[in-house]
Amino acid sequence: MPMLDAMQTQRAVRLLITSKPVAHEVLLRLLELSLKAPTRTNTQDWTYLVVEDPEQKARIGTVYGRLYKLFNPIVTRQAKGDAQELRNMAPGQWQAEHFAEIPVFVIPCYRTSVNHRPTGRPQIRVSSFYGSVYPAVQNLLLACRAVGLGASLQTLPVWWQPSIRKILDLPRDVRPVCIIPIGWAKGRYGPTQRTPIGEVVHLDHYGNQPFRDPVG
């Protein structure tokens, strides 16, 4: 799939074929492409954990299930009465119920032990951490879409850091950023619908939106 088509049709794909594995040669090529993304001063302070072992996936799935049961009722209440929003939530429900069956998890992590690690105020450190990892994450999501794999960015499973760190045997200087469940996508996906660009672009200062369509 051409890259522009992948970008125009990208979405969080949660409905996956659980019985079809993702070959290592395919996954490694996608991970290699994802790491073409830039990092702060080219420190390349990232690392990936690939989880395929059923027992490991089940352990992570247990953590995810507990958090999902905790937070999903809140989201469901917020969507009450909105039929479209409730339909949009259905793939997430399926994913939560089948999380451990998904063929592979990719867990991008940040290594704080590299040189030039950010210092100073917490917001500076956090923005530097994520700014060095999320460009590669987006590359991976696009690469998956381009070859027909479904993928979604999940942060909920890593909210419970102590459990995830213990399951994955993570050293102190390696921080999980998110979990990306990956498998071959079920169904076909057309272009995504987004807010018109004129509604979200401000020129020179906030509130100046010359690209908006005139009302009426």
Locations of the language-model features?
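C-terminal helix-cap and adjacent tail motif
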Residues: A6-T9, V13, V177-G216
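N-terminal targeting/leader regions
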Residues: M1-P21, E25-L33, A37, N42
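Glycine-rich, charged/polar anion/phosphate-binding loops
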Residues: E32-L35, M89-W94, I164-I167, G187
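Small-aliphatic-rich amphipathic alpha-helix that forms the alpha element of a beta-alpha
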Residues: E32-S34, V106, T112, P118-K166
